[in-house]
Amino acid sequence: MAIIGAGPVGLFTVFQAGMLGMSACVIDALSEVGGQCAVLYPEKPIYDIPAYPVTLARDLVNNLKRQADPFKPTYLLGHTAEQVLEEGEHFVVVTDKKVGVRCRAIVIAAGSGGFGPNRPPLDGITEYEDKSVFYHVSDVSRFRGKRVVIAGGGDSAADWAVSLSEVADSVHVIHRRHSFRCAPNTLRNLESLAERGQIKLLVPYQLAGLAGSDGMLNGVIIRNISSKEETRIDADFLLPFFGISAKLGPIANWGLGVESFYIPIDQSTCRTARTRIYAVGDVAHYQGKLKLILVGFSESALACHDIYKVLFPETPLNFQYSTSKKMPC
């Protein structure tokens, strides 16, 4: 099978396919496996993976790849899946580099599709990017003893404010609203740290400007939403967390009935509108869908079992728990 997307759910799909004796080729536009977890949030703690009270996104990706490795998947990294051609009982997935992957089934595990950060409209911000302005955290030690300004009101902003308060000299959180859109437990931690003076919450404010030279910040200008009064905060780093700009790209033109960047699927099988093309993870949608990694893992299992039944109708699949099967050496 061809798996479109090498994020956590795509990697787990390799494992599920391998456990059923099916081989996989994984196609991803990024140069490394892991998707957003590897590129945007490698040091972000994840708390809702069963049996792991907490794991870093980077470690989750590494473990999923190790779990898939015994099945010897082929990885086409740095390739964008552009076309799907039908040749009898086979598909040929053609990439932007004109490489064709011949397969009998396709599993789309594309997450949010291609992505990039939503950049705040500040003059000269590109001069500071990757030097003192970052849209994701790849190395927590960079911020040790530094003055950090975080902008945003969602999970990423709140999570990193809590985490960086343990290492930074100061953490200011800028949000244009009084309420935050993050997990209740994270919000409680954020408010508790603010009450103890370990984090300073500045609401309702928005970013207004940057101060510094040669790509290195020494201050961030913020503006009060109500009074329009501007204030300068001494800062070494700015972390704007305004979400990502995502698009499905060519997948949207594959005749899958895409709705608002999501692919409708049959919840029980993960089948799409096209025979032998499946979708799992965040890109897949049905009524009541929860966008959680563990839900994507479940969908991978459902899809792979259905694919086996479709491809090998004469070979009954006798369900076995993983402990009853032997892993390849």
From Swiss-Prot:
It is an enzyme of class 1 (oxidoreductase). Binds 1 FAD per subunit. FAD binds at residues 28, 36, 41, 81, 115, 282, 323. Keywords: FAD, Flavoprotein, NADP, Oxidoreductase. One of its GO terms (molecular function) is ferredoxin-NADP+ reductase activity. Transmembrane segments: none annotated. Its EC number is 1.18.1.2. It catalyses: 2 reduced [2Fe-2S]-[ferredoxin] + NADP(+) + H(+) = 2 oxidized [2Fe-2S]-[ferredoxin] + NADPH. Gene3D superfamilies: FAD/NAD(P)-binding domain. Its cofactor is FAD. InterPro entries: FAD/NAD-bd_sf (IPR036188), FAD/NAD-binding_dom (IPR023753), Fd--NADP_Rdtase_type_2 (IPR022890), Ferredoxin-NADP_redctase_2 (IPR050097). Belongs to the ferredoxin--NADP reductase type 2 family. Homodimer. PANTHER family: THIOREDOXIN REDUCTASE 1-RELATED-RELATED. HAMAP family: FENR2 (MF_01685). This is Ferredoxin--NADP reductase. It comes from Anaplasma marginale (strain St. Maries).
